[in-house]
């Protein structure tokens, strides 16, 4: 070992200790997660929920667009029909162990029934516990769009009732009467 190699080796050791000394007193970048809340951006895509319309009814009309739009095929549902003619999902299942939280199901939903919330704490010990049924996904409120009602906006009538005669539904506006 030559003197030059010895000096270079000693210099790298001193430089390493200098860098350690500099970074030892800097503010830590690691967040202590459970104690400190995590900042999430406003449009963060986390847990998927099913919402209700302002009347308290299920928004999902079992159109199957969410299942078709899902790139990994983690959504499955079966359509059924109420006596008044409204469709609803007999069962609605999402396998969160396969879900990539891309948000395509939310974009495809015409009734805004599927919404992604900023909740990300979904850790389970068993893979079977990550398969959520409709009862697990359905929340009591309307979610991000509190005033939107698919049947009212689309102008669809319900069997046995004219447009605007359903519970908590306003009569349709005659737009032709507004023209000059």
UniProtKB/Swiss-Prot annotation:
Catalytic activity from the UniProt record: a quinone + NADH + 5 H(+)(in) = a quinol + NAD(+) + 4 H(+)(out)
Comment on bound cofactor: Binds 2 [4Fe-4S] clusters per subunit.
Membrane topology: Peripheral membrane protein
Enzyme kind, highest EC tier: translocase
Annotated TM spans: none
Domain 4Fe-4S ferredoxin-type: 50-80, 90-119
Binding site for [4Fe-4S] cluster 2: 70, 99, 102, 105
EC number(s) reported in the record: 7.1.1.-
GO molecular function: 4 iron, 4 sulfur cluster binding; iron ion binding; NADH:ubiquinone reductase (non-electrogenic) activity; quinone binding
Keyword flag Cell membrane: yes
Signal sequence, start to end: none
Gene3D superfamilies: 3.30.70.3270
Keywords attached to this entry: 4Fe-4S, Cell inner membrane, Cell membrane, Iron, Iron-sulfur, Membrane, Metal-binding, NAD, Quinone, Repeat, Translocase, Ubiquinone
Xref: Pfam families: Fer4_7
Cofactor(s) this protein cannot do without: [4Fe-4S] cluster
Annotated compartments: Cell inner membrane
Positions contributing to [4Fe-4S] cluster 1 binding: 60, 63, 66, 109
Main location: membrane
GO biological process: aerobic respiration
Free-text function comment from the UniProt entry: NDH-1 shuttles electrons from NADH, via FMN and iron-sulfur (Fe-S) centers, to quinones in the respiratory chain. The immediate electron acceptor for the enzyme in this species is believed to be ubiquinone. Couples the redox reaction to proton translocation (for every two electrons transferred, four hydrogen ions are translocated across the cytoplasmic membrane), and thus conserves the redox energy in a proton gradient.
Family that this chain belongs to: Belongs to the complex I 23 kDa subunit family.
Protein name, per record: NADH-quinone oxidoreductase subunit I
